[in-house]
Curated annotation (Swiss-Prot):
Gene for this chain: lipB
Assigned protein family: Belongs to the LipB family.
Positions of the BPL/LPL catalytic domain: 33-212
Annotated organism of origin: Saccharophagus degradans (strain 2-40 / ATCC 43961 / DSM 17024)
Name of the protein described by the UniProt record: Octanoyltransferase
Database matches in Pfam families: LplA-B_cat
Alphabetized InterPro entries for the sequence: aa-tRNA-synth_II/BPL/LPL, BPL_LPL_catalytic, Octanoyltransferase, Octanoyltransferase_CS
Length: 216
């Protein structure tokens, strides 16, 4: 068996967006050439996040949901309970991959995850993320600093999709969102959030060529 580099996996449970964002920045700023890569898994309370390309007009009616201007790529999106948010904190130089290749690998990992639930999905060349019959199930936004990535991907498991109607998701007016629980016959294959997270961790680490190891 080949000794693959370690990917430390941290399950953060339910955690507010801003402290996790700050922790990602601190981790990235503090890491060196020997720091193992990490994957953080989290569910955020309801929040809209604006990417660096975000435009105010895409926030149609945020209402009581807070809006956070963040430093990731992309436009506005929604995070909420029932959405698996995965933050791969990776040394891209060490992995010898570029940003575009990382985006592709993350999209491939979501496609492979959905295939385990017998769902056909695909990325779009002009709109990062993963789609099922034109409806978006996973949103993606990254930042790279010092050759290291942070931010990541949000996969709709059983999240309430209604808040997406309060924005133009990722800057696209009328973009329909979907979620895993609505695409699976749950009488035959139950959708359990913790199981989805475990499957995704296994798939992403394999695609990256890393060995997942749980970190408390």
């Amino acid at each position: 068996m080949t000794d693959l580099p370690i990917l430390h996996v941290k399950n953060l449970g339910k955690a507010d967006y801003q402290p996790v964002w700050q922790a990602m920045k601190d981790f990235t700023d503090g890491r060196d050439a020997h720091t193992p890569d990490e994957l953080w898994l989290v569910e955020h309370p309801p929040v809209f996040t604006q990417g660096q390309a975000g435009k105010a007009e895409h926030l149609l009616a945020p209402g009581a949901i807070p809006v956070v201007a963040t430093d990731r790529g992309g436009q506005v999106t929604y995070h909420g309970p029932g959405q698996l948010v995965a933050y791969p904190l990776l040394d891209l130089r060490r992995l010898k991959i570029g940003v575009r290749e990382l985006v592709t690998k993350i999209e491939q990992s979501v496609v492979a995850l959905l295939a385990e639930y017998k769902i056909d999905s695909a990325p779009k060349a002009d709109a990062p993320g993963v789609y099922v019959n034109g409806d978006k199930i996973a949103s993606l936004g990254l930042r790279v600093r010092k050759g290291c990535s942070f931010h990541g991907v949000a996969i709709n498991v059983d999240v309430d999709l209604a808040p997406f109607n309060q924005i133009n998701p990722c800057g696209y007016a009328g973009l329909n969102m979907t979620r895993l629980v609505d695409l699976v016959d749950t009488t035959k294959q139950p959708v359990v959030f913790s199981d989805v997270a475990k499957r995704y961790t296994r798939i992403l680490s394999n695609i990256l060529g890393l060995t997942a190891q749980l970190k408390e």
